Amino acid sequence: MEVNHQSNDLGLVALKMLAQYHNIPLNPEEIKHKFDIEGKGLTLTSWLLAAKSLELKAKHIKKEISRLHLVNLPALVWQDNGKHFLLVKIDTDKKRYLTYNLEQDAPKILSQEEFESCYQGKIILVTSRASIVGQLAKFDFTWFIPAVIKYRKIFLETLLVSIFLQIFALITPLFFQVVMDKVLVHRGFSTLNIITVALAIVIIFEIVLSGLRTYIFAHSTSRIDVELGARLFRHLLALPISYFENRRVGDTVARVRELDQIRNFLTGQALTSVLDLLFSFIFFAVMWYYSPKLTLVILGSLPCYILWSIFISPILRRRLDDKFARGADNQAFLVESVTAINMIKAMAVSPQMTDTWDKQLASYVSSSFRVTVLATIGQQGVQLIQKTVMVINLWLGAHLVISGDLSIGQLIAFNMLSGQVIAPVIRLAQLWQDFTQVGISVTRLGDVLNSPTEQYQGKLSLPEIQGDIAFKNIRFRYKPDAPTILNNVNLEIKKGEVIGIVGRSGSGKSTLTKLLQRFYIPENGQVLIDGHDLALADPNWLRRQIGVVLQDNVLLNRSIRENIALSEPGMSMERVIYAAKLAGAHDFISDVREGYNTIVGEQGAGLSGGQRQRIAIARALVNNPKILIFDEATSALDYESEHIIMQNMQKICQGRTVILIAHRLSTVKNADRIIVMEKGEIVEQGKHNELLQNNNGLYSYLHQLQLN
């Protein structure tokens, strides 16, 4: 059973549309079987239960029209007569309501009066539980809190070491005070010797503990760094194809490289400076005991540091954003240039490319220089505040000593203590650029880590694929505002059948196979394998059982054997050789000195196009997939290489469902059935000879063009 927009159960239609909006796959047949037992359509209660089963959080409320603009949209307006509709958007200024008429399968704008006439006060708010969890688990600075809790024992050890370091930092000025006020005045050489030995011991302990703290801290932050790096790469590979298609490679690489900024921040002095700053309250208490006036001068300088940082930060952030954007442009241009080096040399456009690079590089250097200048101004401002405070303390301290309110030893001890307080403040102020930079890095990295991965319900325990394929009422477009690529496509393929798909460029041939690999979920309709809706299937389970050979296949910079056995590195050599023979690759591999251990070079640069293609076919066959897709796999080959592959095609296709997409009609003429597509629709299908008999058909026209 396929739920389309002509279904009598508008509740089920609405549920499907809302589920698709929240990127949640839905099996209409399963929902109807579980929750529409009487076959009369979903009731309000059963609708809410069905939504809950899909991990949707649905809440039925009564809401006045005047307060509808406060709710999250889209939402379902529930009608007692079953004429439900979706409320998509509200224009409060013009008092217009954008709705979606489920009966007519079309958007509709209602005036205030029209909406009031059909609104009964009942509305169902729908949100995705997964999206709520995703927002709670959003990658930002709070992500590091669980990591800190996880390694709390190590951080507690670091805190304990920091306490001892601060105690030693407190003792040292006291020793100097005793020397100045007692030893020098009374000429106490024995006391001087004792204090010197004690001070030496304190210094040794301070050095050892400081090194130990740095080691412990670096060790724990390195673990967090490894966890973040591993999570980033796993998440990157789990992102849908659409994420990469909508972004330049250089942009993605630039965002991943932001991990270096976070790493430098975690292992740098910034966090230890924060720990030192936390102990400043103890120092302030001792300093207040020495001289409240001098302490107030120090306290008065702290807002100056803060205000200066607040003034600099927004400007610095804007300049860092500009620097990142220009750096990402450079990264993207560099990747593009290296990838297209053959074209650049063939067309002799190196001067033009160099000119573009020089302009972009100059722009990046200029933005980087502006960041450096502003950071320098910020640091000099901090130095100015520090020097001003030092002069004021010197002048005021000297007055206090002269007036007898403070001894020379106390003044020296106070200055040493104030140095211990101000040092972490100055370091933090000077490292404010790092704080700002790491904040931007976290945001940039969040663009990757907060992007949703490929989703599936994972509730179906699916067996091994047999090979039956069905496309039912498929409608698809790559973006909501993009033109329709596939429109009302219906196609059934029996297991073991060899299907050829032909048509003009842009007719939707490759898109059909992308839906079969679940790179995308159709806007409407179902893609079924052995009767199972692929929207409910684990993408990895599916793709492991489908072999795909494209026109331009990518080989990794590894040996031929490793490329063929990519999905299962421990695969036996017998399986690798069998797949290579089936693909017609064994003979040329045997002729190479290193044989299957030959390194193919980056993207297979050490091999010819035909050799790369045959290795790609072997890689697709080595797992014995029940479904095999050849997407223009032979269109770029010379006739000899194509002949070798076509000779083995009967063996390759044996026991498999095979889909051949080709512009060359000679590639598909022996197929069991040929599908002809035009503008996203199937316009013809049949065997080669049958299609040729239709002189007015597209296939006959394409065949005549190729003959001529």
UniProtKB/Swiss-Prot annotation:
Residues 1-126 form the Peptidase C39 domain. It is found in: Cell inner membrane. Residues 155-437 form the ABC transmembrane type-1 domain. GO terms for molecular function: ABC-type transporter activity; ATP binding; ATP hydrolysis activity; ATPase-coupled lipid transmembrane transporter activity. It catalyses: ATP + H2O + proteinSide 1 = ADP + phosphate + proteinSide 2. InterPro entries: AAA+_ATPase, ABC1_TM_dom, ABC1_TM_sf, ABC_transporter-like_ATP-bd, ABC_transporter-like_CS, ATPase_T1SS_HlyB, P-loop_NTPase, Peptidase_C39. This is Leukotoxin translocation ATP-binding protein LktB. The gene is lktB.
